[in-house]
């Protein structure tokens, strides 16, 4: 039996509300008569907009207040962009669903110029260190400009901040109907996405069996396996938003292939590798690939990144 009423905790940003409303619609279609309410919660990440994420604590910034509301029993579930979800959950809470992945690629937005046509020294707006590292690896002459804010704000900054291009996740643009502003989609081999990019995660109290059962139909097994492998890699590397780590899993039949990448922020030092195996071993594959990357030079790169952070 599905619960009669469910409260979804969500940030008030356009994209977060789209994600929460999508979940609400899916639940209402599945369980006629169910009451689904959205509860808007302001998070630290919404309040601090003038500082790069890396400097203010990275990943957990967009989920902490929502998780606290869940633990207090004020909401029943939360819908997150998987790329914002830390690898550790507070006691009593957990990820119960990973939805089918939207387009995982990075979108390149410019005034009709493709990445390969960018002028020497072009200024690129992005918030993610992994994007900066991968683009600088390909084009060391580029100037990276850190931009924050919601999707519309970032698109506006292209003109306002006199940038040559901005880079955003394609999934968010697709969900909000901004596909027409995209100049090109960057291949996942060229710009490996963030951990979990394009997938949504549903989190709830682990003792709330009725809610867990009601949400189960939204889980997409292939995406869940791929994202579990990506997150296992991230967890082993102890990386948050503030570290240039990327991973992308794809599933074909029962086989999961995972590509992983660790870099220095300037893109000068990079390690990259891939691993394949059974989807049943997703977490093991992610951990094993992380160990390989760390042994191949990733550990030294990350130690250097952390040292620089401490020096700041």
From Swiss-Prot:
Its cofactor is dipyrromethane. It catalyses: 4 porphobilinogen + H2O = hydroxymethylbilane + 4 NH4(+). Its EC number is 2.5.1.61. GO terms for biological process: protoporphyrinogen IX biosynthetic process. Gene3D superfamilies: Periplasmic binding protein-like II, Porphobilinogen deaminase, C-terminal domain. The modification S-(dipyrrolylmethanemethyl)cysteine is found at residue 241. Pathway: Porphyrin-containing compound metabolism; protoporphyrin-IX biosynthesis; coproporphyrinogen-III from 5-aminolevulinate: step 2/4. Binds 1 dipyrromethane group covalently. SUPFAM superfamilies: Periplasmic binding protein-like II (SSF53850), Porphobilinogen deaminase (hydroxymethylbilane synthase), C-terminal domain (SSF54782). Keywords: Porphyrin biosynthesis, Transferase. GO terms for molecular function: hydroxymethylbilane synthase activity. GO terms for cellular component: cytoplasm. Tetrapolymerization of the monopyrrole PBG into the hydroxymethylbilane pre-uroporphyrinogen in several discrete steps. The porphobilinogen subunits are added to the dipyrromethane group. NCBIfam families: hemC. Monomer. HAMAP family: Porphobil_deam. Belongs to the HMBS family. This is Porphobilinogen deaminase. The gene is hemC.
């Amino acid at each position: 039996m599905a619960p009669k009423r469910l409260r979804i905790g969500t940030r008030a940003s356009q994209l977060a509300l789209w994600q929460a409303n999508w979940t609400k619609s899916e639940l209402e279609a599945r369980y006629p008569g169910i009451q689904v309410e959205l509860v808007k919660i302001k998070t630290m990440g919404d309040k601090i907009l003038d500082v790069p994420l890396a400097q203010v604590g990275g990943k957990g910034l967009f989920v902490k207040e929502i998780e606290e509301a869940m633990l207090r029993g004020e909401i029943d579930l939360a819908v997150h962009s998987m790329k914002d979800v830390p690898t550790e959950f507070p006691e009593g809470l957990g990820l119960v669903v990973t939805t089918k992945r939207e387009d995982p690629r990075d979108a390149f937005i410019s005034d009709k110029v493709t990445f390969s046509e960018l002028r020497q020294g072009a200024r690129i707006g992005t918030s993610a260190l992994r994007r900066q590292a991968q683009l600088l690896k390909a084009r060391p002459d580029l100037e990276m400009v850190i931009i924050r804010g919601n999707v519309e704000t970032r698109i506006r900054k292209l003109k306002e901040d006199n940038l040559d291009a901005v880079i955003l996740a394609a999934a968010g643009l697709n969900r909000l109907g901004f596909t027409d502003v995209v100049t090109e989609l960057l291949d996942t081999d060229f710009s490996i996405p963030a951990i979990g990019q394009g997938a949504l995660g549903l989190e709830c109290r682990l003792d709330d069996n009725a809610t867990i059962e009601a949400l189960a139909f939204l889980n997409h097994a292939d995406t869940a396996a791929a994202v579990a492998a990506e997150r296992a890699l991230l967890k082993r590397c102890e990386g948050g938003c503030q570290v240039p780590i990327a991973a992308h899993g794809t599933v074909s039949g029962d086989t999961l292939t995972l590509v992983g990448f660790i870099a220095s922020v300037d893109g000068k030092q990079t390690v990259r590798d891939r691993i394949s195996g059974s989807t049943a071993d997703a977490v093991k594959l992610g951990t094993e690939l992380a160990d390989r990357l760390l042994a191949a030079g990733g550990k030294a790169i990350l130690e250097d990144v952390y040292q620089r952070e401490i020096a700041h």
